[in-house]
Amino acid sequence: MKKTITIFFTFLISILLYPQEKKKIDIKNADFTYINNEKHPDYWRLIGNVNIYHNETNMFCDSAYYFSEKEKIIAFNNIKINKGDSINLLGEKLNYDGEKGIAIISKNVILKNTTSDIESDKLIYDIDKEIIFYNSRSQIVKEKQKISSNKGRFYIKKNEYQFLDSVVLKSKKYSLNTNKLIYNENENINYLQGPSKIYFEDKTIYCEEGYIFNEKSEFFKNSYIENKDFKINADSIFYSDLKKSIKAYGNVFLTDTINNMVLSGNEADFFEKEEKMIFKNRPLLQLISDSDTLFINANKFENFILNNNNLIIAYSNVKFTNNNIIGKCDSLTYYNSDSIITMYEKPIIWLDEYQVFSDTIKINYYDKKINKMYLNSKPMIISKIDTQEYNQIKGEKMTGNFIENKLSIINVSGNGQSIYFLKEKKETIGMNYLESSTINLVFKNKKINNINYEATPHSLTTPIENLKHKDRFLKEFKWRINEKPTINEIINQ
């Protein structure tokens, strides 16, 4: 019994340690076979309709040298290599090493696959591993695209191509340059690895990782889309060529160099046909100026292209600031054709110590500077003097004029009213109430320096000790300092 077990294990070890001998090359056919053991004992000369079989692979040629001791073939003209239904290799010269299972095909080489062809000067076919690779400029030709590269591999089992070094893809809709491209025939997906640029007729896409699948694409790692008008950067970009839409996530920035504008957020949608953009998730609009950039913060922005001009709508909890003002409203529009910013629903602006509000506020932002401000319904200006003391001015309409983004004059028209508290040696001695059809306020060093009236005003001064609490405030008075956002809240969210 022990002897039987010993013999069995000896046999098993011999199988594991010494692999089975490979099958020898089988010469299936040759019109003429020349064997001369004296002149060339190391090879046979095969001529005419040569058919060689090895490793489940058929090789055809016009003529060949067969080195039987080394299990090698050197073949010439009309080379054809077939393995199953998937591989059909054509060329003019073949070097085949039967011991290694390596076939090197050169000169006018074509690999015909089910749906694509590889054209090359030289292909190396590892029959055992079922890999075909090349190290010189070659291209794959499909029905809708061509891909060329300096190096490449084709994994037969996975039906997958790997293109390396100076990869160029050309199709009807776009062209692509990259360092590495993986194309899977079964999935019909192009995977991009390394710096990649995709050129469409109207835009360029860059990424360092991504994929292209039929009409859908996704791009990661320093990705951006650029056209003649703007550039979109994001952590990841999804592009649908069918819908002509873009979805971007993470650190999304739209840079418009024509209009000196940057729109950012963590999520954005772009609709090319509708010429519309939506920014969400902590969006921020920057109207760029060399001297004083305006920052606008909101819950959502929509940007429309109308007659080649931008209309931007900011929705919900809108806040903005530059070096001189802070503003707040529920919604806002900016149309670059007339450079008008319009504030809606409880709009308010803080100018240093002054609070300015109205039902609606319009700001002329020509040349990226605040030039004029229009308050067209129930406008009021308030500045706080003490706990119960506020200087106030109101009217039917107000127009503010700015010089270099700094308020210089405010004109109040229609039923102008004002309340001013009078001081003597820092003590409040009384309050002046005044009515006038027009009031002009002149500012200097960010404070009211002079007040002018175009008609004789009606004025009443009341000593502080006789002043009733209700008379301290004009109608519609509301001190809204608790709503004032900080600059950091606006810019850094």
Residue ranges: model-predicted function:
Residues Q20-Q493:
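N-terminal amphipathic/hydrophobic interface segments
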Residues M1-I25:
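Bacterial Sec-dependent N-terminal signal peptides
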